[in-house]
């Protein structure tokens, strides 16, 4: 439930207009709520004529994701946002081939135990199974719509790549597309625009490996993996895009930092976590 204080400057708004223009609800989100003005249920088409308290209750959505107890590393949680540090080798969301033992199953279980309710995980971002790090989950449709439209979400990754990158910084702008039904993505002239900024953090001369920070400006599937491979510096352990044999058990890619505008406070929230031990190269 959301609670908003109606002030004089909101007089004349329809409730739907107030929720969209002032509180950043989406049109779709308004179809999933019930609203109460000073305790009385009203329609969203009602015009605001006096000060008061507006309560917005979201209708519960159903989920077919089975609750399964899976350890969660919760980095941040409030009434709108949940952020977890996903461990490597864990699928984010059920697929046709993997229907349980995913992060989504664990999140549904967490809220079932905590609140006794069925929870629909609204993932803002997802990570490949072998990629570790921060995942943002909206806890309601209001937060989901705000993050998508006004959240100014920034995502930063650490990656260990083959070879020594001589440049200290570079920006890669190469379109990415899918060829046929293959899982693999490639640089294609008619692909979707994709932009990644790469900053060199440390060069490991002895092991011929470079640690880089990657900031995503777009969110294409496998974007960092494709762009770094295109540079000639595939990520260690990347079996799909790497052309150099190694004995690394997973791709060395970690979502280590996110920042976003919080949907309720409108303040910038930034969170950062360290890398897993397997990425701490010598």
Residue spans of the language-model regions?
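RNA pseudouridine synthases
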Residues: 1-282
């Amino acid at each position: 439930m959301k609670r908003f204080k109606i002030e004089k400057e909101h007089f004349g708004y329809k409730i739907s207009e107030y929720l969209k223009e002032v509180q950043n609800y989406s049109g779709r989100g308004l179809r999933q709520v019930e609203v109460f003005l000073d305790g009385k249920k009203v329609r969203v088409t009602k015009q605001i004529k006096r000060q008061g308290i507006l309560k917005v209750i979201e209708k519960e959505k159903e989920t077919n994701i089975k609750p399964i107890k899976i350890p969660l590393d919760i980095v941040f949680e409030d009434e709108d946002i949940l952020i977890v540090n996903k461990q490597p080798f864990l699928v984010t969301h059920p697929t046709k081939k993997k229907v349980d033992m995913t992060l989504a199953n664990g999140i549904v279980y967490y809220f079932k135990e905590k609140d006794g309710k069925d929870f629909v995980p609204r993932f803002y971002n997802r990570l490949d199974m072998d990629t570790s790090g921060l995942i943002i989950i909206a806890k309601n449709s209001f937060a989901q719509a705000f993050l998508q439209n006004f959240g100014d979400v920034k995502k930063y990754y650490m990656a260990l790549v083959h070879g020594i990158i001589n440049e200290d910084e570079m920006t890669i702008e190469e379109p990415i597309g899918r060829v046929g039904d293959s899982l693999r993505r490639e640089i294609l002239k008619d692909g979707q625009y994709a932009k990644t900024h790469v900053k060199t953090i440390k060069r490991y001369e002895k092991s011929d490996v470079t640690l880089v920070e990657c900031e995503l400006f777009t969110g294409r599937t496998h974007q960092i993996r494709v762009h770094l491979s295109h540079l000639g510096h595939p990520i260690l352990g990347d079996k799909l895009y790497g052309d150099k044999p190694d004995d690394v058990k997973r791709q060395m890619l970690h979502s280590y930092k996110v920042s976003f505008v919080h949907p309720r406070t409108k303040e910038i929230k930034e969170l950062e976590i360290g890398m897993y031990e397997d990425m701490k190269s010598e």
